[in-house]
Structures are given as C-alpha cells and as structure tokens.
C-alpha cells in the first residue's frame, strides 16, 4: 500500500519508521510531478521542500504548534501531509487553493501570498501565546527570496528582543525566488553555505583545550571571548546572533534525520532560533533542476516528459508585447532603465535584461525599495520603468505618493496581472490599483485594450518626464485588435449602433471586447449604444464628460473594484461639469474573490458581454422610457447589488 495514501494527518506521519521516510518523500515528488504538470501550479518550490515539510510535521504538533508558510506557494507538501490529497483541481474553481487556506484546514493559519510577512505574523502570535499563557511553539518557514524583503528584517529585529519566547524561523535557502536571489543577503547566505569548517574547527578546539591539564580551561575561556571575532571572520552567521537569534546550520534540507535533529534542538531551546536549511528548488525532477531561468517555479499544464505545453499558446500575451516594446525603446533611448522586484521574467523584462544588463535592476522582493530607488534614478536623469504585478504595487503606495509623485518625477509603472487574475486567488487579483492610484496627484493611468494600444501607451508613458505614469494590463493572451472608428479628444470611439445612441458604454482597457459584444446584444434589444475607450483613464478626459452629456445613460465597465475606480472618477467629473446623465458603474465586487479561472470569475460577476448587456438593459428599462425589450430576455442577477441611484450622479 502506498505510504502517502496512509497519511490523513501529521499523527500518521509521526508513526512512520525513519526508514519509511525517504520512500515517502519519493512518493510525494512523483505525486507532485504527476498532478501539477497536469493542472499547472507552483512545481519547483514544492519539490524543494518535501523533506523539510516531512520533518516539520514530525517534530511539531500542528495545528497546536503554529506552522506559518511565508508566501505560501511552497505549501503543497504541507497540504498533502495534513489530509488534503485531492489535487485534481488545485487552483481551479471549487478545488484546493494553491496557497494555504483557512477555509480548507485548521493547519493553515495565514493565507496571504505576499512575501516577507510570515515573520511579522509569527512575532505577534508568539507574543499573544506568551501573554495568554499558551504553551506552544510558533514556526515560520521563509525562503524563495522572501528574506530580501525589508518587512522580514523589521520582524527579525523585534523577534530577537524576547529571548524567552519560543519561535523557530526556518530559512529555506534555495538561492532563488522566481529566478536566482540577488543582493547582499544572497551573498551572505551563500557564504554560510561554504563555511562548514568553522563549526568543526570550533568543536575540535574546545575539545582539545578542555582536555589540556591546568592551562586548558582558562585558555579556552579566554579564547571563547574571542568567539565573535572568529565568527565574523569565518562564518557570518554572527549577523543573526548579533541580533540575539540563536543560529543552527547550515543543514542539508533534504536530509530528513538531520533536519529533524535541528528542529528538535530549536524547539527545546525555548527562545528565537534560526534553522538554516539548504534546499534545491525543483529537486528530483531533472527538467526543473536544469531550468536556470526559474526551476519550474510556476508551470502551466505540461507534458511531464517533454515539458511541452498541453495547450500551446494561440497568440501573443500582454506581457510579451510589453517586453518587445521595452526592448525596442531601450535601443532608442539610452536613458531608459528597467526596475523590478524579483520577477524579471514574469513581467516580460527578460529580453531587455539580456540586451541591457547594466540598465536592469532586480531589487529582490522589495517593492518599496524598487519605487524609492526608481525615484533616485529619475532624479539622477534616467527614466525608470518599474514593472511589477498590479497587486504588489499596493505594498509601495507611500513611495509612489511621496517619493515619486510629490517630486514630480518621470517614473513609469507597468502593472502586469491587473484586474482579475484568477487561479492564484484573492491576494493575486490586481483589483485595487485603479482605486488606490486615483488619489495620487499628477499621476496618469493608461489601460490599453489591445496590443497596438500597449505599444502606444508605453511609448506615451515613458515620454512623460514631469509626473509618474502607469500602464496596466491583465494576465494572459491578447484578443483581436479593436480599432477605433473615431477619436474625440483622447477618447477612442469603437462602435455606434444607431444614429443617436441611448447609452454610452465606457470600456476600460480589456473590457472593450465585452462592451462591443454587449452593444450588439443591446441593439437587438432595441437599445442603441456608443462604445468608447478613454485610453488614459486618469485624469478624466473632458471629451469623455462631453460624450456623457450627449447620451441618456452612461455605463462604465472596468476590471477593478467599483469603489474609487474609473466609474467613480467619471461620476465626480460629471458632477463638477453639471452633467446630469445617470451613470452606472460595473466592476469587481468589493470582496475577496475565490480562486477560479479569469473567464469563470468575469462571467460570475457579470463582466462578460452577456452580463454587461443584461445589467445595462435592466437599468435602461427603468431609467429610459421607451427603450425596447428583447423577447425572452432574462434578468441578470449580480453577486452583489448594484448601486441603485434613482437620481443622476
């Protein structure tokens, strides 16, 4: 009987004989390769933590002891060992989350997949346990480059303050985040990997001196006072110990017995301890181990033998179009530089970095520093393009506001994965950036609808030298081009379905396709519409306000939360201009969305052509006397109630 099928929880794991653990590890790797290559997901990080996860659940009593996974994408093995072995729909609608999920299991305590936060959680949990008299250990596993984030070091500084608070920090050191980890800390950890001789030398010296008659013990005591100097010279773990943190390691993270021994020592110490484990991302799957780009960090469904995509891409992606345009701009403008935060390839900067390595700055998982450093680059006379996932720019809002916008600096932010992302769940949806950035004075935002507009808007953005600019686009493949039939001011008119249209459909970026489909459906229902793309959604173009006044109703459609988004900004601009046309804003509900595909989520929240048409028709029938009704039309019921404004916005 396979070992894995006998594991329904950590207690079953602890009953296994040590000789059974390597076969179990091999079984888990085979399971991961078989399942994750079929469904897609984070393969490389999880192959690297198999033995570490086994050891953690054998030494600590989860969920009584708290095990926290920083970033969380390396928690697949943890899920398997805590009774969740149905990976057939991992990251799919109604399947397991690709991250820890409190709704799934009491073994999952935190589920935020943004990096460098687990140590802060662990600090607070350990403090709460101490104050409430709860006897248990808190364990935080951090790796995949998360120690390059400043939050982790802020937490370490506080954790070290209490020497009697049981907290174990496991550093999963695989030398990588998405790609190889960069920066001084990476070099420091690399140094620790190569100084095993220090501990052997110290142990030999202690033994030899203490066995020497008369002078041995006093001499050892004197030399022991010089321990810090030896450590700083030979093994820089002194950096951790100078903070007041006990350091154990480095340890082979694939040696279960060795990891268990270190974890038991750490647990019994009773204070904050760092256990430094050396692991190999992609361990046990040769294609992953040989992939120098990212060790199969995250894969789409692939053939496990050929590693070819199960469903080859049918066209270019938003990311690839941006990457090619950056490469072209780099050749034209020597002052253009690229900045990213540990995601060079995922945001499309790989070609630029290869062509211009000296003009590419990957700062690690440190978004705040990325933006502040970009401000410095702009102050120095360069034009930085900061490319990150939309959800991660939230982490650097203060730097955008105070270090870039306040100084009126020409910094361009390119936000990949904007709007509904889908499979990676709530924390990866880029559904807040349009709302958050609306409040930044002077900042301009473009939302391209197709490949041509990506190229156009990126070029326009990097030409602005006296204010920050933003270009946002979603994850995935591009749809067909949506050419304009007319441009009014800076607004592209995409379609008119009648000589005097009733409704102005304002399509934000990739919502253009849904709005064009909706306009056709509405025309069949007797409701005529003009479909426009504002292109630059902040500030609101006066031409858009004039167009709103020329229609009987305005409907904005955006891949962003409704609160504070483009619809809200247009409503305010209309009020300021005394335009009393009723406005309805369609967008993402103000809630954390469960994981599912982008298409499934857009359909569920009504941001497809059918959904937009149904909601628009319902409002039009109520607000616009004399509008037609398509026979057999069904009322659309959104997940959350739409704002019912009986009076004009």
UniProtKB/Swiss-Prot annotation:
Positions annotated to bind Mg(2+): 144, 174
One GO BP: isopentenyl diphosphate biosynthetic process, methylerythritol 4-phosphate pathway
Q: Name one Pfam family in it.
A: Transket_pyr
Question: Which pathway does the UniProt entry assign to this protein?
Answer: Metabolic intermediate biosynthesis; 1-deoxy-D-xylulose 5-phosphate biosynthesis; 1-deoxy-D-xylulose 5-phosphate from D-glyceraldehyde 3-phosphate and pyruvate: step 1/1
Spell out the residue ranges making up region: Disordered.
623-649
- Which residues bind thiamine diphosphate per the record? 73, 113-115, 145-146, 174, 285, 367
Query: What's the record's note on cofactor binding?
Result: Binds 1 Mg(2+) ion per subunit.
Q: What is its EC number?
A: 2.2.1.7
Looking up SMART domains in the UniProt record yields: Transket_pyr
The record's annotation in Gene3D superfamilies points to:
3.40.50.920, 3.40.50.970
In alphabetical order, the GO MF annotations are:
1-deoxy-D-xylulose-5-phosphate synthase activity; magnesium ion binding; thiamine pyrophosphate binding
Which positions carry the signal peptide feature in this UniProt record?
A: none
What keywords is this UniProt entry annotated with? Isoprene biosynthesis, Magnesium, Metal-binding, Thiamine biosynthesis, Thiamine pyrophosphate, Transferase
Q: Kindly list the cofactors needed.
A: Mg(2+); thiamine diphosphate
* A GO cellular component entry from the record: cytosol
- Give me the reactions it catalyses: D-glyceraldehyde 3-phosphate + pyruvate + H(+) = 1-deoxy-D-xylulose 5-phosphate + CO2
Q: Which family does it belong to?
A: Belongs to the transketolase family. DXPS subfamily.
What PANTHER family does UniProt report for this protein, alphabetically? 1-D-DEOXYXYLULOSE 5-PHOSPHATE SYNTHASE-RELATED, 1-DEOXY-D-XYLULOSE-5-PHOSPHATE SYNTHASE, CHLOROPLASTIC
Describe, as the record does, how this protein assembles with itself and its partners: Homodimer.
Designated name of the protein = 1-deoxy-D-xylulose-5-phosphate synthase 1
Gene that this sequence comes from: dxs1
